[in-house]
Regions:
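An acidic/histidine-cluster motif and surrounding catalytic segment
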Residues: 1-75, 79-235
């Protein structure tokens, strides 16, 4: 990661030790993560990798909250940069993020959006491995005293008042190397199980799914590439 970011001198890089959910005891997880609300919201238990990921992102958000910065770029350590980040200067990042409106700006793909533009407004998105977030958004997410969902539950955060923007075409992808594939955060665990949700939540979850299908049908979905060891292998 250090070598990857060294070419971008405009970034002031700070590394944060991730929280490994696999090393946490059941008591530690119960103390820091709301398992009951998680089941009602997602209809399933999160695995330890997902819990550790959610707690790690909150740790990064607290760093931003306690700093004097207006916003920060959060990158996970297994990403591949597929477009030159020096191009960010042409997107008006300061204008987008230097605001009291809770805002995130995704550099990743896998998002649904309304109107085609260089910077789009998202309906929903998947992934939390590369995004700008401003102080207001960090405060908004941290206002959930005890987390109960995944780090990239952007739709829930949007319902709380978060504005989700994204750069199109996207700039950063998750690197599907063998270390990631064998990690505790695996694709088969993503999503939710309506059968085990609260009834209200289960019913309401159908509407966003329909909207996303329609947006994808009309070409308003930014599909991501597949990257293996830093090389694009398909889409």
């Amino acid at each position: 990661m250090e070598e990857l970011l060294a070419q971008y001198s405009f970034l002031q890089v700070e590394y944060i030790d991730a929280i490994d959910g696999r090393m946490m005891s059941k008591a530690e997880i119960s103390d820091r993560f709301d398992l009951y609300s998680c089941m009602r919201h997602n209809g399933r238990e999160l695995n330890r990798g997902e819990i550790g990921c959610a707690l790690s992102h909150r740790k990064a958000l607290r760093k931003l909250k306690d700093s004097s910065l207006d916003y920060a770029l959060i990158l996970e350590d297994d990403v591949s940069i597929i477009r030159n980040l020096n191009e960010l200067g042409g997107y008006g990042i300061d204008n987008i993020l230097s605001t009291d409106r809770p805002t995130v700006l995704l550099l990743s793909g896998d998002y649904w959006y309304f109107k085609k533009a260089a910077v789009v407004t998202c309906y929903d998105a998947i992934g939390a491995y590369a995004y700008f977030i401003n102080r207001a958004a960090a405060n908004l997410i941290l206002s959930i005293g005890k987390p109960f969902t995944v780090a990239d539950d952007w739709f829930m955060f949007k319902r709380m008042g978060l504005h989700i923007k994204a750069i199109r075409p996207y700039m950063v992808d998750a690197n599907l190397n063998m270390e990631q594939l064998s990690s505790d955060v695996k694709q088969e665990h993503w999503g939710f199980d309506r059968r085990r949700m609260s009834k209200t939540r289960a019913v309401l979850s159908y509407f966003p799914a329909i909207i996303k299908r329609l947006l994808k049908f009309i070409g308003h979905y930014e599909s991501k590439y597949h990257v293996l060891y830093g090389k694009v292998i398909g889409k």
